[in-house]
Amino acid sequence: MPRVVPDQRSKFENEEFFRKLSRECEIKYTGFRDRPHEERQARFQNACRDGRSEIAFVATGTNLSLQFFPASWQGEQRQTPSREYVDLEREAGKVYLKAPMILNGVCVIWKGWIDLQRLDGMGCLEFDEERAQQEDALAQQAFEEARRRTREFEDRDRSHREEMEVRVSQLLAVTGKKTTRP
């Protein structure tokens, strides 16, 4: 089953959902809302160091659970995200984040920053051309494999039917009955 839609770029550029989120807009950290602010700050920083966080686009209410690792990372082993994905050093009091993902069948990268005190900031989605091409190639391979297997099945089925028809004809010839084909 393909993980992406056939024309990802078109969907990203034309769908209202993506158009809204591709403009830089206000975001907020949404984790542990029931906890005191100081605890939320500490939990947010720890989550970033672990390579994950929950954010929301304020204007649309869209919530995302982000992972700050390269798209190829499978999560088999625990690792710390690189500075490319979680940058606590670029600007004092802020963390810059990057999270690749497939969202609604489209390869995107969420990019943004969050103020470490207020736990809000700015972020947006960008189309991930490189990953889109990789996923398109995988989808095409899966399609071709399914087509090949269907052809093989149809060939085996046709061969089996022909073999059965020959056997039935031979059996009828031995018993002396005539066969009428529909």
Curated annotation (Swiss-Prot):
It is linked to A chromosomal aberration involving CBFB is associated with acute myeloid leukemia of M4EO subtype. Pericentric inversion inv(16)(p13;q22). The inversion produces a fusion protein that consists of the 165 N-terminal residues of CBF-beta (PEPB2) with the tail region of MYH11. Cleidocranial dysplasia 2: A form of cleidocranial dysplasia, a rare skeletal disorder with significant clinical variability, even within families. Patients typically present with delayed closure of cranial sutures and fontanels with multiple Wormian bones, retarded ossification of the skull, shortening of the distal phalanges, dental anomalies including supernumerary teeth and eruption failure, clavicular hypoplasia or aplasia, wide pubic symphysis, vertebral anomalies, and short stature. It comes from the Eukaryota. Belongs to the CBF-beta family. The record marks E165, V166 as: Breakpoint for translocation to form CBF-beta-MYH11 oncogene in AML, subtype M4EO. Changing P100A: In a breast cancer sample; somatic mutation. It comes from Homo sapiens. Heterodimer with RUNX1, RUNX2 and RUNX3. Interacts with COPRS. Found in a complex with PRMT5 and RUNX1. (Microbial infection) Interacts with HIV-1 Vif; forming an active cullin-5-RING E3 ubiquitin-protein ligase complex (ECS complex). It is found in: Nucleus. One of its GO terms (molecular function) is sequence-specific DNA binding. This is Core-binding factor subunit beta. GO terms for biological process: cell maturation; definitive hemopoiesis; lymphocyte differentiation; myeloid cell differentiation; negative regulation of CD4-positive, alpha-beta T cell differentiation; negative regulation of transcription by RNA polymerase II; osteoblast differentiation; positive regulation of CD8-positive, alpha-beta T cell differentiation. Keywords: Chromosomal rearrangement, Disease variant, Dwarfism, Nucleus, Phosphoprotein, Proto-oncogene. Its main location: nucleus. Changing E54K: Abolished ability to promote ubiquitination and degradation of APOBEC3F following interaction with HIV-1 Vif. Does not affect ability to promote ubiquitination and degradation of APOBEC3G following interaction with HIV-1 Vif. Forms the heterodimeric complex core-binding factor (CBF) with RUNX family proteins (RUNX1, RUNX2, and RUNX3). RUNX members modulate the transcription of their target genes through recognizing the core consensus binding sequence 5'-TGTGGT-3', or very rarely, 5'-TGCGGT-3', within their regulatory regions via their runt domain, while CBFB is a non-DNA-binding regulatory subunit that allosterically enhances the sequence-specific DNA-binding capacity of RUNX. InterPro entries: CBF_beta, CBF_bsu_sf. It holds the Pfam family CBF_beta. SUPFAM superfamilies: Core binding factor beta, CBF. GO terms for cellular component: core-binding factor complex; membrane; nucleoplasm.
